[in-house]
């Protein structure tokens, strides 16, 4: 029995060696796509952008380097908002301007003030948009002495919190005909002679993609894992800064 098994093993190893030596690595297929919009990153930002674009009639290709969509958004609990419809139903009194003033003070004014203002003033619209798309929220106070700004994401198809939001958005992308390519990280932007961005180069384990597009949206996530980008954009020593 041992001799028989050893012969089988030897034959299998020999066959594998021959295949490796003769066949070599598989050559990636070259694929070219043309679309209206290509979005890099299928977290909550990328998924939301894909839904909005597809609803307006655009053809959308959504790229994600992981083999699942959502990224860190799957582990989120909720989102911040002031003066949302849910806040009004609760008779919460905090205004966007009050929240904006408090946030600037808490961050000692070391922030991009116009961007922070846009975020706070647009937060209610974000929640209202999600609610119109079937996302459920419960508004809570993070602590007894804070205002009720935390909108905890409710259940969707047996999932809760961030995973529920991601599942909801992915279902809508599928219904709207968005082409989602997981396991396919973007590698570089395509530019024309004038320097305008006209597409994306991407690569999966089996395919090399050239995706020509009228517009490119970068929604690839936080810079907090890159010390160089934190230093460049946040103007802080990333070695001593924890996000």
Language model: regions and residue ranges:
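Extreme N-terminal leader/targeting segments of oxidoreductases
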Residues: 2-37, 55
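Beta1/beta-strand and adjacent pyrophosphate-binding region of the FAD-binding site
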Residues: 31-45, 61
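Redox-cofactor binding/interface segments in oxidoreductases and associated redox assembly factors
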Residues: 40, 82, 218-219
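Short glycine/serine/threonine-rich phosphate/pyrophosphate-binding segments
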Residues: 46-49, 225-227
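Gly/Ala-rich phosphate-binding loop of Rossmann-like dinucleotide-binding domains
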Residues: 50, 54
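Conserved N-terminal/central alpha/beta ligand/cofactor-binding core
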Residues: 58-59, 65-179, 183-185, 228-237
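Conserved beta-strand-loop-beta-strand element in the redox core of flavoprotein oxidoreductases
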Residues: 190-210, 216
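Glycine-rich loop(s) and the adjacent beta-strand/alpha-helix scaffold that form part
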Residues: 204, 211, 215-243
């Amino acid at each position: 029995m041992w001799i028989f098994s050893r012969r089988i093993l030897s034959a299998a190893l020999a066959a594998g060696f021959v295949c490796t030596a003769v066949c070599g690595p598989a050559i990636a297929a070259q694929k070219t796509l043309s679309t209206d919009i290509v979005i890099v990153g299928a977290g909550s930002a990328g998924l939301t952008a894909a839904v909005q674009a597809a609803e307006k009639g655009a053809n959308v290709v959504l790229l994600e380097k992981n083999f699942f969509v959502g990224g860190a958004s799957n582990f989120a609990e909720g989102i911040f908002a002031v003066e949302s419809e849910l806040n009004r139903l609760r008779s919460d009194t905090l205004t966007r301007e009050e929240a904006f003033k408090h946030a600037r003070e808490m961050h000692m004014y070391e922030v991009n003030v116009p961007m922070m203002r846009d975020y706070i003033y647009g937060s209610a619209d974000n929640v209202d948009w999600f609610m119109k798309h079937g996302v459920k929220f419960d508004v809570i106070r993070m602590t007894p002495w804070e205002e009720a700004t935390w909108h905890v994401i409710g259940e969707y198809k047996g999932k809760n919190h961030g995973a529920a939001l991601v599942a909801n958005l992915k279902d809508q992308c599928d219904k709207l005909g968005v082409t989602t390519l997981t396991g396919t990280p973007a590698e570089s932007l395509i530019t024309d002679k004038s320097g305008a961005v006209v597409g994306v180069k991407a690569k999966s384990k089996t395919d090399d993609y050239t995706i020509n597009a009228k517009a490119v949206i970068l929604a690839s996530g936080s810079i907090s894992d890159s010390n160089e980008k934190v230093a460049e954009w946040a103007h802080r020593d990333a070695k001593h800064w924890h996000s």
